[in-house]
Amino acid sequence: MTKVQNICLLESKIFQVILSQETNKATTMAVILETELQSLMFSSQIPDIVIGTSDDNEVEVCLDCRDHTIFSALHFPYGRSVKIHDLRSVVEYYLRDRNTSIEDFQLRAVTDGRSVTLATFKVLYLEQHFTGDIGEFLRNNFLTTMAGKLTSPMATEFLHFFIAAGSQETVRYQVVASVDDIDGGEPRVYQLTENCGTSNYDRIHRLEVTYEVMMGLVESPAQGRPRDAITIHAYSVHAGARAFTFYVQRHEPPLSLYFRNAFNVFERCDLQAVTTHKPKVDRSIAVTNRISTFYNQQNEKEYEVETSGLTVEQAKWIEQLFYSHDVRMATMREDYSEETYGSYNPTYMPQILITDFNCEIHDRDGELNSVKFTYQYADRRTYLQTDYLSVDHDRIFTSPYNPTYN
């Protein structure tokens, strides 16, 4: 064999090796997503992921969010297919940890060191199963399962709703109030409209609704009349086709909580309830020189709550309170100025843990529901009740002491 023939044979073998390597690479990169994913979906709607491969070589499946990987697993295909179960739980844990309700995600497959983007999609947090159309739901509903609720003059309420990129939403407030000497004290409707602005991305918009703001809508048309002459009966909030109504009760509820609901947004829960305080002490006893001494003492307190009558709708809504991973004890708001709006944040309020509950919901006519639950503060150190120390408290030195016994 001549030298030229040897060179040609060598080049032919090199070409075959290169061609074989390129063929193997092409085969390795043949990865396809067989599951259909919507561009926008609730977390509970994320299906099991099925990825088809052209061979049985290993494939790494990754889920990315905000330029970092939150899930990564190496799989070996069976029958040229990889199936990932319950990816929705990974997404929900991530959203809960970030205290957010909506994020963009990217699903990737990595084979032979090369990454292939299989899908990009947006997820909105929802723990419970949802079978309707997500677009229609978001256009017609705030992120709550209630259409209305009782509120009080000291309450700060939150409403959240979805705004698509490029959309412009207008919020309209309607207050039903009576003013003495105006129309004979008959209820009238006062309105305010504000624009939420536009954004280049999908977002969850938060509305902060207070009795003080609603009172401000009425005070101007009331022509300087004192607040005692103004009675607010209810106020409603409208954003597009969405609507929510707050009915005002004069007295403050004995127990007020904020909790992250099924959509992972804070919602206020005012309860007419009786609370039983149960302090206890966990400690050990040591005996030294025949003298007993306490040590390792830990003071704790549990609170047992029994609510008054609840409608079926209220009881089903409060069920989300028991499922919630983040429950806060509402603190008193002292400042309602415009400068403080947005700073009243339940995230900075004392966290509580609902350790036990009894919730049996029925829909019998003429009979209301009642739920019981037990909670304790996440910080095991007990709290000092200071409301009675206030100089403005109505129980201090406002009535004479009368030692009357039966």
Regions picked out by a protein language model, each given a short descriptive name:
Residues M1-P253:
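Preference for solvent-exposed, low-hydrophobicity sequence contexts
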